[in-house]
């Protein structure tokens, strides 16, 4: 239903569930890519599933300028093992959010599956180098 101020109004006890196309995680796996002329920041929920006992969910924020990006993980939980590291870089005016297998881990999680949801926030100011 249409909500106030251009929002979407949901009925009580209505939620979203995500089971999108998953991405296998290997070295330098690009999870998402966006142009900084369109968006300046994004809020991610990343769900990682390796097997029945190794699962992880990560909440992170990304903000980017013309030649730099900053990523902050503000929430993370798992069943005992960190599975991935998350980073963001700017390359030719595009932000890439990248997953790598956890560098400090004692297990090999090669091929873990990632699913994500994201809210993008539009760039307001013109890009000036």
For every predicted segment, state its role.
Residues 42-44, 97:
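Hydrophobic residues positioned within well-ordered beta-strands of beta-sheet architectures
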Residues 12-41, 49-55, 68:
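Surface-exposed ligand/attachment interfaces on beta-rich extracellular proteins
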Residues 1, 57-60, 84-87:
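Parallel beta-helix/beta-solenoid repeats that form elongated, surface-exposed shafts/blades used
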Residues 45-65, 101-104:
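Short, flexible beta-strand-to-coil junctions
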Residues 77-129:
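Low-complexity intrinsically disordered segments
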Residues 61-85:
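Terminal beta-strand-rich extracellular "head" domains
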Residues 1-16, 44:
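Low-complexity, small-hydrophobic/phenylalanine-enriched stretches
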